[in-house]
Amino acid sequence: MNSIPEGRPTPNLQRTANKRGVARLAAVQALFQMDVAGTGVMEVVAEYEAFRLGKEVDGTQYLDADPQWFRAIVAGVVEDQLKLDPMIHQALTEDWPLSRLDSTLRAILRAGAWELKARKDVPTAVIVSEYVDIAKAFYTEDEPKLVNAVLDRLALVIRGESRGAKPRHKS
């Protein structure tokens, strides 16, 4: 098991979340760990499933998560990262390249982008809202607004709809 990198973000969640929401949060943390510590996907998934999801860690009780949802997000982001990053880059403003974002924000955007692309069964508004909530757990400034704007732009490109908007129908 890898130790947690120093400076690793810890969320400030005040409300209880559903198992998929917890899986999303854990996936963002795992993607952060992979980015910062260079941990591999198999190793980080095994670590989270064995020692974190639903477990007590350093006196903090991790909430129970949907392990299949967690695995799908982490593995999906890793598998599709070369496709996701250019899409995210296009959704960012010109003065904010993806490389300028911190690791946590990149993890949130990659996970949200993957879910928009791969999980058509989940409503756009749910995905955007969940990842905005995750951003709010880590940030108090403008980052949640950035997550909302970027995922909304991506939803328009990927699904032909934005948060709260109905899908466009072709005649």
From Swiss-Prot:
GO terms for molecular function: RNA binding. Keywords: RNA-binding, Transcription, Transcription antitermination, Transcription regulation. It comes from the Bacteria. One of its GO terms (cellular component) is cytosol. One of its GO terms (biological process) is transcription antitermination. It holds the Pfam family NusB. PANTHER family: ANTITERMINATION NUSB DOMAIN-CONTAINING PROTEIN, N UTILIZATION SUBSTANCE PROTEIN B-RELATED. Involved in transcription antitermination. Required for transcription of ribosomal RNA (rRNA) genes. Binds specifically to the boxA antiterminator sequence of the ribosomal RNA (rrn) operons. Belongs to the NusB family. This is Transcription antitermination protein NusB.
